[in-house]
């Protein structure tokens, strides 16, 4: 039986495709707008656990690179965990992000062809109303400025920017 886990907090993702990413409207079947997809999926956990281990305060970035449509698989995936995380927290985040303990990444794990490993770096998250930026030391940076909604210019038209539970309920 796998370890029970739950995480909640701020989630951000962005890729190098033109707006709007074709994966979103084609269930990952379209060609990336620049031939390959380079994406960063960021989670800043405010509350969470892996069994009895607290994951509150842990930040991590899942880096994904694909050639061609994401649905075709053979993704290269790497994980960057904040350098303030304990060794046990890094192991737990690795298990969650690999899909080995269920949750959203379990379905995506079949698409991964190459796991590039886990690195540790200082992760800084800057989140404003209509933008975010994340740096993971010298390893990665992810950011976006949202397009204002016509109905409410202070809200984004569309953005994968959530405060939500990442684990299955």
Which functions belong to the PLM regions below?
Residues 60-63, 137-142, 163:
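Short, surface-exposed, charge-dense and proline/glycine-enriched linear segments
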Residues 162-169:
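Conserved small/polar residues in nucleotide/adenosyl-binding loops
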Residues 82-151:
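Charged linear interaction tracts used for macromolecular binding and regulation
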Residues 2-48:
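N-terminal ordered "arm"
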Residues 35-106:
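Aromatic- and glycine-enriched beta-alpha-beta binding-site module
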Residues 157-160:
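Short, hydrophobic/π-rich interface segment
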Residues 20-26, 42-43, 58-63, 113-117:
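Short amphipathic alpha-helical surface micro-motifs
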């Amino acid at each position: 039986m796998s370890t029970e886990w739950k995480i909640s907090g701020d989630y951000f993702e962005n890729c190098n495709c033109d707006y709007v990413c074709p994966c979103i409207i084609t269930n990952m079947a379209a060609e990336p707008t620049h031939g390959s997809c380079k994406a960063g999926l960021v989670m800043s956990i405010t509350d969470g656990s892996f069994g009895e281990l607290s994951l509150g305060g842990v930040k991590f970035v899942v880096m994904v690179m694909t050639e061609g449509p994401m649905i075709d698989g053979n993704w290269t995936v790497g994980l960057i965990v904040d350098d303030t995380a304990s060794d046990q927290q890094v192991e737990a985040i690795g298990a969650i992000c690999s899909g080995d303990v269920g949750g959203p990444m379990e379905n995506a794990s079949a698409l991964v062809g190459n796991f590039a490993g886990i690195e540790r770096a200082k992760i800084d998250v800057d989140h404003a109303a209509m933008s975010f930026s994340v740096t993971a030391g010298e390893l990665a940076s992810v950011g976006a400025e949202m397009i204002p909604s016509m109905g409410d210019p202070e809200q984004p038209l569309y953005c994968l920017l959530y405060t939500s539970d990442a684990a299955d309920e």
